[in-house]
């Protein structure tokens, strides 16, 4: 998070307008502009743990990470700068939450890439903070309005639910595969052996569907789940509870908060961070797995077939095997051996 995103570059064209403002930054915070922009005061709220890690180093307690913002998170702010995410329901959850807390009269700026659908902010906020487009550059739009009416926000109304083979999956806006089990995860699930035992870590757990499906036919596994996304962490906790499955769930930037070693690490790693393509998380997962696998333990991941993971697996573990594949996806398996440890 050093180079500015196109959305931040558009905001910088108006930097003089923010010098006397007390700003709350929120939404898809892909860089550290909240810490660097010259303002009277700055706060940031994010649902992404890895974004909070970067911002908290520079902003301290003025950077907050949670599913739902509180009054303390927006205290004394007179301006909201909201970075539009690629997921419209996620934007609605976050904006209704924030606008329910900010006082009437707050200046509202919404910025985002055109391809993210930022123009739909006008309709979404029409009843609360009518927006006008004030700038267009770098394939982004910047919108401005003033809060005229606070919405009523109820986080419980944003929960969704679906069933997979008799399992209940709880979801929230912004969680991967919110509307159903994705094809890649289905392929990975098909490879999991019944009656498995030992400690299992689910990295990038999303709604927790991989873990509860695994636990159903391998009830003796001990589950740990982690994700960078606050909605994913809460959804996974709810999914485990709905299916009577025990497990520890917490926020982590891949392995940043993970302690100890496991007999198996499973993952359907992301290759996007917001609107940006990024293989960093998956490569960090593969390279870091050797520090969190017991001897003989395995890493098992599913990925789009075109992604360049075989080389990283071979560099890290000394070898890998493809244990299932379709035209679009492959399931990779790598075993923790002495050769991998030496690597």
UniProtKB/Swiss-Prot annotation:
What is the protein named? Ribosomal RNA small subunit methyltransferase C
**Role according to the record:** Specifically methylates the guanine in position 1207 of 16S rRNA in the 30S particle.
> Where would you say this protein principally sits, based on its record?
cytoplasm
The family this protein is said to belong to: Belongs to the methyltransferase superfamily. RsmC family.
A single MF term (Gene Ontology): nucleic acid binding
Q: Where in the cell is it found?
A: Cytoplasm
Cytoplasm as a keyword of this entry, yes or no, is: yes
Q: Which reaction does it catalyse?
A: guanosine(1207) in 16S rRNA + S-adenosyl-L-methionine = N(2)-methylguanosine(1207) in 16S rRNA + S-adenosyl-L-homocysteine + H(+)
Instruction: Spell out the subunit comment.
Output: Monomer.
Q: Which gene encodes it?
A: rsmC
EC number annotated for this UniProt entry: 2.1.1.172
**Cellular component GO terms, alphabetically?**
cytoplasm
Name the UniProt key words of this record, in alphabetical order. Answer: Cytoplasm, Methyltransferase, rRNA processing, S-adenosyl-L-methionine, Transferase
HAMAP family for the chain = 16SrRNA_methyltr_C (MF_01862)
Q: InterPro entries, per this entry? A: DNA_methylase_N6_adenine_CS, Mtase_sm_N, rRNA_ssu_MeTfrase_C, RsmC/RlmG, SAM-dependent_MTases_sf, Small_mtfrase_dom
